[in-house]
Amino acid sequence: MKKYIAEMIGTMVLVLMGCGSAVFAGGLADTVGAGVGTIGVALAFGLSVVAMAYAIGGISGCHINPAITLGVFLTGRMNGKDAGMYMIFQVIGAIIGSAILFALVSTGAHDRPTATGSNGFGDGEMLQAFIAEAVFTFIFVLVVLGSTDPKKGAGNLAGLAIGLTLVLVHIVCIPITGTSVNPARSIAPALFQGGEALSQLWLFIIAPFVGAALSAVVWNYLGDKK
């Protein structure tokens, strides 16, 4: 049970810090003058992963992302029961993080599109968004699988490599979708945002899972002993 709780806490921190930076960099920047820009948001997500990797990595492996859990499961590193429980607790943690963030922004008159840090895409941009989310999730999860491989991995540097990769992914993908590469990170804000964020949510669940599955296939080949 401890590893499930660890995943819940880690995902809560990721959503609160990452989406929180997006909210206060975008939706509230004009009113409080605290905008940090794309680089700042990217760093917030990446540094959250680094921090949690060294905080809970020894307990749960610090997936804090259903796409990563799927990749780990498909490479035979965890069983189906644990994979399912990880995903459930990740979503719960994300909802808690979004609830805290929603409470913070709803205390004032901040009715902005970025009020919860939800993901989305514009008219005619669905294919672009799907490709971006699938490709960048593929890259991200491949780095996770490679850097955490028991024999070929980066050891204690894995957390840093994973966090920096997430920073790079956000820098490129934020202008396209706001960057998800993490179904839990998208589900929770969409539940509080509603409307278009909820109607477009399917893409931010399916595309990351497609990318994660492809990364598992590739790593099963690359990491094969033969």
Regions found by a protein language model. Give the residues of each.
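Membrane-interface helix-loop junctions and terminal tails of multi-pass membrane proteins
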Residues: 1-226
